[in-house]
Amino acid sequence: QIERFRSEVTRHKLEVVVSHDSYLINLASPDPILRARSIASFCQELQRSGALGLRAVVSHPGNYLDDRDSGVERNARAYAECLRAVPGELEVWIEGTAGSGTALGSRFEELRALRNALPDDVRTRVAFFLDPAPLPAVGYDLAHGETVWEQFDSVIGLGLLKCLHLNDSRAPAGSRGDRHEWIGEGCIGPEPFRRIMRDPDLAGVVKIIETPKRDDPLRHDRRMLRRLRAYARGNTQVTAGV
């Protein structure tokens, strides 16, 4: 199965393939038993993804439950332990969150602190993955998209932004919610996505849709891809049916 998967990736000329770790994993947990289980599970995720020849494993930071700074430290130690246990070129791309409850990773400064807490020998294998959907929910202004990416560049550096999940949002600004909607049809609207698709600074960033599937997943995915390609061409008259 592994060889068949690798063969299909080559046949379809897929340049970047990533996986997403289990949502049950909590590498920031103060509970030693839960944290140990999470570390074991994340190591298995890395091993499987490495065997499949993937570029990276996408990982949400954990929930700290007690103290935020301690959670960042625990999360970083766990990433380091797992990356050392599974050497190679496979990377971890930390995905920003909506920051609900005690979830880490809603602010760029917190993402930077998490990566900076990693030892030198594994830090180069860790980068970032953002989803526009929760950005307004935690206070970032996508209506003026240049500002968001300038902020990221100033705090972390755009060179460390490896991938974007392209989703509109059903969660209003400031809600700390993360509920996806079809691109251009949610609280974010079409204009920020047009800018993303035409921004030369984001041209080398991988873009993956994660929009709702509803009644017909393949049809809706194709519709979203057509819409994004139209945005990239500068089309400003894309209708809801496209």
Regions found by a protein language model. Give the residues of each.
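N-terminal pre-domain/capping segments
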Residues: 1-21, 25-44, 234-242
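Acidic (Asp/Glu)-rich catalytic clusters
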Residues: 1-18, 43-53, 80-89, 115-125, ...
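Structural preference for beta-strand elements that scaffold enzyme active sites
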Residues: 15-18, 55-58, 89-95, 125-129, ...
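Active-site beta-loop-alpha junctions enriched in small/polar residues
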Residues: 21-24, 62-64, 95-101, 131-137, ...
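Active-site acidic/histidine proton-transfer and metal-coordination neighborhood
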Residues: 27-127
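Gly/Pro-rich active-site loop or hairpin
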Residues: 69, 104-112, 136-204, 212, ...
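Alpha/beta catalytic cores of nucleotide-metabolism and tRNA/nucleoside-modifying enzymes
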Residues: 202-206, 233-238
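C-terminal helical cap(s) of enzyme catalytic domains, especially alpha/beta-barrels
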Residues: 217-235
